[in-house]
Design a protein with these regions (language model features):
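Membrane-embedded alpha-helical bundles that constitute the cytochrome b-like, heme-associated redox core
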Residues: 1-215
Length: 215
């Protein structure tokens, strides 16, 4: 296990940046569902059948999620014991509620991921590896909009993305500081972090509401 405080922060930062890259890719594919049903089906079919994605990248992603949460839990325990927030980015936004409640927002996001895996990943495993149903490259869009027929699910998804936005608002910029990026780039990183933290979660909310209203 990673022992030193600095090593834990760097590990937390790197795993967070890795998950941000995945989030950007996931959003890009999902957003195509509001533009083109055919394009969304093609991209989803590729991601769902490509061996590299299924048997290498997907396990790495799952490990990354678990690792990031475990590191966050360890940092939270260490911070509580020392009665100070060690994992912080000294700026106007980081000294707020956001930076003091990263663990809480992380718990909400983890709960959302549990529902998300149940909604999409578990049925996919059942479809391909338990029931051995025939390959249907056109099924992905219908499966997506079916999940967003439920207003309670849409509401929970939307609330979860609000917490994701708050989590990213602090974590994105903090990650670069933790890995030692020069202060010379701080303002640019902060601007990109805020834009990403607002626009991507808002985009996910838009996708959910769009399919609820048009499904």
């Amino acid at each position: 296990m990673i022992e030193s405080s600095i090593s834990r922060k760097v590990a937390m930062a790197l795993s967070g940046l890795f998950l941000i890259l995945f989030l950007a890719q996931h959003f890009t594919i999902n957003f195509t569902s509001v533009i083109s049903e055919d394009l969304f089906n093609k991209l989803s079919h590729f991601m769902g059948t490509n061996p590299l994605v299924q048997f290498i990248l997907q396990p790495i992603l799952i490990f990354g999620v678990i690792f990031h949460f475990v590191m966050g839990f360890i940092l939270e325990i260490k911070n509580r014991r020392s009665r100070k927030v060690n994992y912080s980015y000294q700026s106007g936004i980081s000294s707020s509620w956001i930076s003091r409640n990263m663990f809480f927002s992380g718990i909400v996001i983890l709960s959302f991921l549990g529902l998300h895996f149940y909604d999409f990943w578990v049925p996919e495993i059942k479809y391909k590896y338990i029931e051995f149903l025939p390959n249907d490259p056109e099924r992905y869009y219908e499966e997506l909009i079916h999940k967003f027929h439920n207003p309670t699910r849409v509401a929970f998804y939307s609330i979860s993305f609000v917490f994701l936005s708050l989590h990213l608002m602090h974590g994105f910029a903090s990650s670069f500081q933790s890995v030692g990026v020069n202060n010379k780039y701080s303002n640019t990183i902060k601007t990109i972090a805020i834009a990403f933290s607002v626009l991507v979660p808002l985009g996910f909310v838009f996708i959910a509401i769009f399919h609820y209203l048009n499904g």
